[in-house]
């Protein structure tokens, strides 16, 4: 049911001008009541804390308390919160919204585990040590929307100093990752954590990944096991290993662009992909042909030639409310 609109005029409007660095951003007006698209729009949809109480937080203690319950709630993060700590557990029916580009969690990440209906938007998460988990982790949970976030660490340390940036594992389902700046990291995004977890993951891990900017990554853009993925209109700059489809995963890969990197789309162990209108740069698609040719939701698809200008400077913490 894809609505294949190659709306170049809209892309030009969003980009304004060709941007060479994410420091030049294009603000986009958003509403706290926005709801998810992609796979997160399925299974009843993802509305987060819509209709619940609104709380603004600026400290670690305030934040951990505000996000913990399963009651409907909107938590607005004001400023940078720094704490070297384990992932904070997020309750169901939660919207976590960064007030502006200064809303950053540094040293600790988020864990959505055995929950549902969570939105994380306009939030920075950075430099979470491996001992403290991933920047954003989703496990045994469904209907999660990660949008306009900025997740990063650095590559000054070895690959095991930090863990993942966005890891969706243990049968996570109906998740959308969109408009997010994923950068400066070794192992970026892991969807399905183990070759031996097929009994749990098969039939789940339905994930949309769209309009993200991935820059200076070594691998996992993403690494995708067992599930069903729709990856479209993402821009990859200097990503060594891009999309790795594995263990029977079926991916629909459309309108993505790579600059730098030799392995844009590949499979290390029996994953599959249908690829349409991608610009693989200096690399090539070596993934076996898959069977996923459509998805159960409508979406707007940019031509590959319009993706860079539409994504760079728009992905990341660029929303205003």
UniProtKB/Swiss-Prot annotation:
Cleavable signal peptide: 1-20
Swiss-Prot/TrEMBL cofactor(s): Ca(2+)
Amino-acid positions noted as binding Ca(2+) in the UniProt annotation, renumbered to this chain: 134, 163, 167
Carbohydrate attachment residues: 93
Listed EC numbers: 4.2.2.2
Active site: 220
UniProt key word Calcium: yes
Gene Ontology BP annotations: cell wall organization; pectin catabolic process
Location of the protein in the cell: Secreted
Cofactor binding note from Swiss-Prot or TrEMBL: Binds 1 Ca(2+) ion per subunit.
Catalyzed reactions per annotation: Eliminative cleavage of (1->4)-alpha-D-galacturonan to give oligosaccharides with 4-deoxy-alpha-D-galact-4-enuronosyl groups at their non-reducing ends
Stored Pfam families: Pectate_lyase_4
Keyword tags: Calcium, Carbohydrate metabolism, Cell wall biogenesis/degradation, Glycoprotein, Lyase, Metal-binding, Polysaccharide degradation, Secreted, Signal
Function recorded in the entry: Pectinolytic enzyme consist of four classes of enzymes: pectin lyase, polygalacturonase, pectin methylesterase and rhamnogalacturonase. Among pectinolytic enzymes, pectin lyase is the most important in depolymerization of pectin, since it cleaves internal glycosidic bonds of highly methylated pectins. Favors pectate, the anion, over pectin, the methyl ester.
Name the UniProt record assigns to this protein: Probable pectate lyase A
Species this protein is from: Aspergillus oryzae (strain ATCC 42149 / RIB 40) (Yellow koji mold)
